[in-house]
């Protein structure tokens, strides 16, 4: 058996790969003009093919994904061509903004645990924040800013305590250390 033949590509496999590649390139070529397509390098074409595949996979999974820039341009030109037909139906459409992770973080309010008001405390229902930043400080009522509030100041752990002290635990059994002397010292 010849080792060179085992690793050689079969013409059938090469034909399948080139057929798949040409089909993928045809799908992507519709997003570009002929001049742009001819100017593009092979690596740029391949990256566009991969971007489109990823977009299709993410939309099939149900994620709301933004279109790649090259795909947006084609849709914009297509919609301009069909605007005359769709002008009367345009008012019925509702445009929904795409939700990104950063936008989602800004929308969702940060929930702080509320401590129930105790009888005899003068907090009068004002929730108390817990955590290392606030160290039990009372929050101001909404709408009123605290005069002692500083914008860029973060209070960390107290300076007197070591940061790892809460992680240490006591030994259950005492360890007794004995001093071991060298045998050479005993002989002298």
UniProtKB/Swiss-Prot annotation:
<feature type="modified residue" description="Phosphoserine">
    <location>
        <position position="123"/>
    </location>
</feature>
<dbReference type="GO" id="GO:0006355">
    <property type="term" value="P:regulation of DNA-templated transcription"/>
</dbReference>
<feature type="compositionally biased region" description="Acidic residues">
    <location>
        <begin position="179"/>
        <end position="188"/>
    </location>
</feature>
<feature type="compositionally biased region" description="Basic and acidic residues">
    <location>
        <begin position="112"/>
        <end position="122"/>
    </location>
</feature>
<keyword id="KW-0805">Transcription regulation</keyword>
<feature type="domain" description="KRAB-related">
    <location>
        <begin position="20"/>
        <end position="83"/>
    </location>
</feature>
<dbReference type="GO" id="GO:0005634">
    <property type="term" value="C:nucleus"/>
</dbReference>
<dbReference type="InterPro" id="IPR019041">
    <property type="entry name" value="SSXRD_motif"/>
</dbReference>
<dbReference type="InterPro" id="IPR036051">
    <property type="entry name" value="KRAB_dom_sf"/>
</dbReference>
<keyword id="KW-0597">Phosphoprotein</keyword>
<feature type="region of interest" description="Disordered">
    <location>
        <begin position="1"/>
        <end position="22"/>
    </location>
</feature>
<comment type="function">
    <text>Could act as a modulator of transcription.</text>
</comment>
<comment type="similarity">
    <text>Belongs to the SSX family.</text>
</comment>
<keyword id="KW-0804">Transcription</keyword>
<dbReference type="InterPro" id="IPR001909">
    <property type="entry name" value="KRAB"/>
</dbReference>
<protein>
    <recommendedName>
        <fullName>Putative protein SSX6</fullName>
    </recommendedName>
</protein>
<dbReference type="Pfam" id="PF09514">
    <property type="entry name" value="SSXRD"/>
</dbReference>
<feature type="compositionally biased region" description="Basic residues">
    <location>
        <begin position="157"/>
        <end position="170"/>
    </location>
</feature>
<feature type="compositionally biased region" description="Basic and acidic residues">
    <location>
        <begin position="147"/>
        <end position="156"/>
    </location>
</feature>
<feature type="compositionally biased region" description="Basic and acidic residues">
    <location>
        <begin position="75"/>
        <end position="96"/>
    </location>
</feature>
<dbReference type="InterPro" id="IPR003655">
    <property type="entry name" value="aKRAB"/>
</dbReference>
<feature type="region of interest" description="Disordered">
    <location>
        <begin position="74"/>
        <end position="188"/>
    </location>
</feature>
